[in-house]
Every structure is written in C-alpha cells, then in structure tokens.
C-alpha cells in the first residue's frame, strides 16, 4: 500500500477532519518567498550585509534580527524611501523592531499569490484549495493561505 493510499484510508476512517500544519517551505515553494534570513537580508539597506548582523549575533538569527531592526529603525525614520510609510505608520511604532516589522508586512502584502498558478504549480494549488480541513496552523506572515482557504 502506498503512503497516499494509507493516509487516505486513515482520513476516511476518522470522523474529524485533518488540520494542516504549514511551514515557511510552503510559501517558498508556491510564491517564491525568501527564507527568514533571506527576508532579513532584503532589508539590509544601511551599508551592512546580513552576514554582519549574523556574525555580531554569534549565529543567533533572532538576535541578528534584533540588531538589524535597531539599525533599520534609525534608517526608516530618515530615509526618503520610507517617508510615506512613516507618515502612515508612525503611530504604530512601539519599539525599535516596529519599523522593520511594518516594512516586512508591506513587502508581504505586495506579493502576488496568483503567481503560484503561473509557475507550474496550478494543479497542486487547485488540489490544496479543494481540501476539506478543520483548521490550519501556521506561523507564515504572507497571505497565500488566506487566498487558498478564504473561509479559515
């Protein structure tokens, strides 16, 4: 019996539906989103590469993100690139990581989830969106899952 047949049998024999556990590989595969370190690298605009922050943090990614966020905070307030975002979001600033979080959210909101349909994944995406699941558990920030499963 193949794994597909085995899983199908298990799911058919259960009264409750399945939960999907979705990780970052999902967004990387279907919409080309960077890894966490790749996403942080995208916002290294202050003259220091991501490797500088990673090295300063002794390889600890959350600490590297905090160091980057501190530098980005200062950059965000003074950069013409972000002047419109500053006007729109300055009331949301709660700490030195807020500016980076805002701009990551802005970047993710601009991603086109329909790209997954154009990149050879149409059949997979359509199959996934037709699943009847009881819930989805994820830490992903992008909106691709919301598009696939609008009722959750």
Region locations from a protein language model:
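Conserved catalytic-core helix/loop/strand module for nucleotide-ribose chemistry
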Residues: 1-152
């Amino acid at each position: 019996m193949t794994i597909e047949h085995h899983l199908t049998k298990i799911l058919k024999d259960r009264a409750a539906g399945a939960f999907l556990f979705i990780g970052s590989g999902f967004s990387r595969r279907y919409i080309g989103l960077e890894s966490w370190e790749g996403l942080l690298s995208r916002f290294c605009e202050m003259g220091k590469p991501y490797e500088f922050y990673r090295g300063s943090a002794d390889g600890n990614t959350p600490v590297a993100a905090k160091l980057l966020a501190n530098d980005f905070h200062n950059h965000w307030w003074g950069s013409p690139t972000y002047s419109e975002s500053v006007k729109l979001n300055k009331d949301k600033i709660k700490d030195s990581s807020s500016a980076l979080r805002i701009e990551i959210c802005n970047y993710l909101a601009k991603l086109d989830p329909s790209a997954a349909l154009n990149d050879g994944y149409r059949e997979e995406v359509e199959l996934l969106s037709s699943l009847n699941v009881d819930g989805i558990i994820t830490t992903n920030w992008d909106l691709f899952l919301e598009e696939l499963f609008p009722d959750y």
